Swiss-Prot record:
GO terms for biological process: proteolysis. It comes from Latilactobacillus sakei subsp. sakei (strain 23K). Residues 100-222 form the MPN domain. A motif (JAMM motif) lies at residues 171-184. One of its GO terms (molecular function) is metal ion binding. Zn(2+) binds at H171, H173, D184. This is UPF0758 protein LCA_0852. Keywords: Hydrolase, Metal-binding, Metalloprotease, Protease, Zinc. SUPFAM superfamilies: RuvA domain 2-like. InterPro entries: MPN, RadC_JAB, RuvA_2-like, UPF0758, UPF0758_CS, UPF0758_N. Belongs to the UPF0758 family. Gene3D superfamilies: 5' to 3' exonuclease, C-terminal subdomain, Cytidine Deaminase, domain 2.
Length: 224
């Protein structure tokens, strides 16, 4: 006798039909696991989705914002952030995975998904071999809202460790604006000059805004 999905608890439904069979509310129920003394988990899931319909913008919510939802305490807020980060990393690795031939366009588009909306400035390097295949992606700096003080030695320390022939730098502007600052331009020039001395090429430096990216090479700041 077949069991009706409508009569199953969400976890039972996952076991029989897979997680893809769940509605958003059921999926949230499974993730949250339990409610509170006064609120069943189903109600907490409903309130989560009222705040973030279709889970939209959930990955950008901080711990304070998540805890404003009744029924979500510090532990559940941390778990939700961890799940969002896991999802983000899986999505990035679908294209920015090791061995894939990278280009500025591909890296820029993928990094928009991962860095747009972040409130802290981050500097990353995508290290490549002689065929432009990805060797490693490394976060070099996590800064404040208005400053980034990464040093070229960090960039090249990892380039040497990974035996990289080339790399693409990426950093985000929390303001969402794409225009490079004087600091961005000067830092890029220092990196290019150091790379020429070491025989490790900086292919590009990408700035990630709210929905677009800017290539400093295309803007003429990187010259071979």
């Amino acid at each position: 006798m077949l069991t009706s999905q409508s009569k199953l608890q969400p976890r039972e439904q996952v076991a029989l039909y897979g997680a893809a069979s769940l509605s958003d509310e059921q999926l949230a129920t499974v993730i949250l696991r339990s409610g509170t003394q006064h609120l069943p988990v189903e109600v907490v899931a409903q309130r989560l989705l009222q705040r973030y319909p279709d889970f939209q913008d959930l990955e950008q919510a901080d711990l304070v914002q998540l805890r404003q939802i009744e029924g979500i305490g510090p532990v559940k807020a941390i778990e939700l952030q961890a799940i969002c980060e896991l999802s983000r990393r899986i999505q990035n690795q679908r294209t920015l995975r090791f061995g894939v031939v990278a280009s500025s366009q591909m890296v820029g588009q993928r990094m928009i998904e991962s860095l747009a909306g972040e409130t802290q400035e981050q500097l990353l390097a995508v290290y490549l071999d002689v065929k432009n295949q990805i060797i490693q992606i490394k976060q070099l700096y996590l800064g404040t809202l208005n400053s980034s003080v990464a040093h070229p030695r960090e960039v090249f320390k990892w380039a040497v460790q990974y035996s990289a022939a080339k790399f693409i730098l990426v950093h985000n502007h929390p303001s969402g604006q794409l225009a490079p600052s004087t600091q961005d331009i000067n830092f890029t020039k220092r990196i290019v000059n150091c790379g020429q001395l070491m025989g490790i090429t900086c292919l590009d430096h990408l700035i990630i805004g709210s929905s677009q990216y800017l290539s400093l090479r295309e803007e003429g700041y990187l010259v071979d």
